[in-house]
Amino acid sequence: MTNIRKTHPLIKIVNHSFIDLPTPSNISAWWNFGSLLGLCLITQILTGLFLAMHYTSDTTTAFSSVTHICRDVNYGWLIRYIHANGASMFFICLYLHVGRGLYYGSYTYFETWNIGVILLFTIMATAFMGYVLPWGQMSFWGATVITNLLSAIPYIGTNLVEWIWGGFSVDKATLTRFFAFHFILPFIITALVMIHLLFLHETGSNNPSGLISDSDKIPFHPYFTIKDILGALLLILTLMLLVLFSPDLLGDPDNYTPANPLNTPPHIKPEWYFLFAYAILRSIPNKLGGVLALVFSILILMLFPILHTSKQRGMMFRPLSQCLFWILAADLFTLTWIGGQPVEHPFIIIGQTASILYFTIILIILPLVSMLENKLLKW
């Protein structure tokens, strides 16, 4: 009798994706983040579901319902903090996953890469809407500032903002619809993840050398299931250390003050994982220009396959490109730091310099250096 996992219509899909999947034998720990992102997504959906059972999306009771979850619900504080810090872990894994893709040239798989960028946008939208739900000061003012950016769109901007708000300011209608979207989007993300995997399994995984690895593939199970379990344990350990010892480390103290439309916080800033984009937005004095720079700072990822001028796929054997990659990484850390600082000297000029450097490296320097490395190959 043939093995059921190879014949059953449903089980064989799982088999081809996670058990008998031919995998390059030399993939490093940088390839662990895909499975870790899957784990983060499942954790966020489950904790979010339990939070939604007790949360009320009304401006008068939203803040107190979160307090009620933390104080009165069995392990409510744990569920809430796993969900809040789980989002941070999600973004850490996400940025490392994207960084791996850039370093090893995984963006040459067009479909997989583009679906991945769409996923990044969707996850960012979901996280933003989730941050509004506790209805603290930073929730309210963050929602006001970010949604207000859409008013920079010529002609339809103001109408668009009022349509999204459901009125003339961020209020009950806004909170209710944000909760509805925050609930539905993770399921859309799950569907996109399946498409992402579908396209990936059409081509097979990339590997650190960037060479075709068809002649040296091994089954995913048990080799990489064990490796992924190790990664998962380390992720869970990090998350639980964060949740149980310093759950508010990455949050904003202002969000423990109920939303007050009459009192603006001194420094309005988003969660840490949006600070780099926020710094790019603030570095341009013009409103529409800032919004375009903000969108393009993420959308630029879609240009990488077009901007790839090297004859080699990854950066493993390209020291000049490696240097540029790490300068870009340092630049993103600088932007993240600047995004959390007040708008004053010297932070303004540092932010503007870092923003210019970000776009210059990606659009100009990296393609030129790749072409130079092609020339050096002939020597």
Swiss-Prot record:
Record's cofactor remark: Binds 2 heme b groups non-covalently.
InterPro entries tied to this protein: Cyt_b/b6_C, Cyt_b/b6_C_sf, Cyt_b/b6_N, Cytb/b6-like_sf, Cytochrome_b, Cytochrome_b_C_euk/bac, Cytochrome_b_N_euk/bac, Di-haem_cyt_TM
Transmembrane helix as UniProt keyword: yes
Coiled-coil features, chain-numbered ranges: none
Sequence positions that bind a ubiquinone: 201
SUPFAM superfamilies on file: a domain/subunit of cytochrome bc1 complex (Ubiquinol-cytochrome c reductase), Transmembrane di-heme cytochromes
GO biological process: mitochondrial electron transport, ubiquinol to cytochrome c
Gene3D superfamilies found in the cross-reference section: Cytochrome Bc1 Complex, Chain C
One GO CC term, this protein: respiratory chain complex III
Cofactor requirement: heme b
Pfam families on file: Cytochrom_B_C (PF00032), Cytochrome_B (PF00033)
Organism superkingdom: Eukaryota
Chain positions recorded as heme b b566 binding sites: 97, 196
GO molecular function: metal ion binding; ubiquinol-cytochrome-c reductase activity
Binding annotation for heme b b562: 83, 182
Compartment list: Mitochondrion inner membrane
Membrane topology: Multi-pass membrane protein
Miscellaneous remark of the record: Heme 1 (or BL or b562) is low-potential and absorbs at about 562 nm, and heme 2 (or BH or b566) is high-potential and absorbs at about 566 nm.
Subunit (UniProt): The cytochrome bc1 complex contains 11 subunits: 3 respiratory subunits (MT-CYB, CYC1 and UQCRFS1), 2 core proteins (UQCRC1 and UQCRC2) and 6 low-molecular weight proteins (UQCRH/QCR6, UQCRB/QCR7, UQCRQ/QCR8, UQCR10/QCR9, UQCR11/QCR10 and a cleavage product of UQCRFS1). This cytochrome bc1 complex then forms a dimer.
Protein family per UniProt: Belongs to the cytochrome b family.
UniProt function note: Component of the ubiquinol-cytochrome c reductase complex (complex III or cytochrome b-c1 complex) that is part of the mitochondrial respiratory chain. The b-c1 complex mediates electron transfer from ubiquinol to cytochrome c. Contributes to the generation of a proton gradient across the mitochondrial membrane that is then used for ATP synthesis.
Protein name: Cytochrome b
Taxonomic source organism: Petaurista albiventer (Chestnut giant flying squirrel)
